[in-house]
């Protein structure tokens, strides 16, 4: 499963890697420590605004470049946690990218020190803020024209979600009153429904390999 490059090869990712390679290694490792401890903490800043300004001036990079670096590092740790990679396997994956060896060692060291804590925390959290609660469906028919009896059929799927902020786990008694319900309605023709089904089959196969 991890034989492929789990980090992909997008231009945005590679641009951020190029910036990371130029950073001073000891300071970069301190940044990684802050990043890894924010994995799974939704809507929480990694650095304060004043800290970001200091680091941007220190590294002589723009705010947009710094944001790209943080997002890239977060993505690497999120993928690492998703696949439950060991520090050595993380190194093997990073070798498939353009990341320099000294920065790869930083990721390895930080993950080795923090992986147990991060993985234990993530096991108590939902990765996505919306949790699927209920699925409903119905068929919809529409006459193609007044001169024919041919009907165009489509499937209407209704997905109901709970929007539950898990960051307040210490207030579980109050959380039950703070759950917001969201609804999504999707319409598929026959071809779209088949494509959607095949995607779900692919996802199920990957989940089975992780079970």
Curated annotation (Swiss-Prot):
Residues 131-211 form the COMM domain. PANTHER family: COMM DOMAIN CONTAINING PROTEIN 10, COMM DOMAIN-CONTAINING PROTEIN 10. Belongs to the COMM domain-containing protein 10 family. Component of the commander complex consisting of the CCC subcomplex and the retriever subcomplex. Component of the CCC subcomplex. Scaffold protein in the commander complex that is essential for endosomal recycling of transmembrane cargos; the commander complex is composed of the CCC subcomplex and the retriever subcomplex. This is COMM domain-containing protein 10. The lineage of its organism: Eukaryota, Amoebozoa, Evosea, Eumycetozoa, Dictyostelia.
């Amino acid at each position: 499963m991890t034989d492929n490059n789990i980090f992909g090869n997008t231009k945005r990712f590679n641009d951020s890697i190029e910036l990371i390679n130029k950073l001073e290694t000891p300071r970069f490792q301190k940044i990684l420590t802050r990043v890894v401890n924010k994995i799974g903490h939704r809507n929480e800043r990694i650095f304060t605004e004043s800290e970001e300004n200091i680091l941007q001036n220190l590294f002589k990079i723009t705010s947009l470049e710094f944001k790209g670096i943080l997002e890239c590092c977060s993505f690497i740790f999120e993928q690492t946690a998703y696949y439950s990679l060991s520090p050595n396997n993380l190194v093997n994956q990073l070798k498939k990218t353009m990341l320099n060896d000294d920065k790869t060692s930083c990721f390895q060291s930080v993950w080795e020190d923090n992986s147990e804590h991060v993985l234990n925390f993530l096991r108590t959290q939902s990765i996505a803020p919306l949790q699927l609660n209920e699925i409903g469906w119905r068929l919809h028919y529409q006459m193609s024209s007044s001169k024919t009896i041919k009907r165009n059929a489509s499937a209407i799927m209704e997905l109901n979600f709970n929007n539950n902020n898990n960051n307040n786990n210490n207030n579980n008694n109050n959380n039950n009153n703070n759950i917001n319900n969201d609804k999504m309605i999707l319409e598929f023709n026959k071809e779209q429904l088949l494509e959607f089904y095949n995607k779900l089959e692919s996802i199920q196969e990957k989940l089975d390999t992780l079970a």
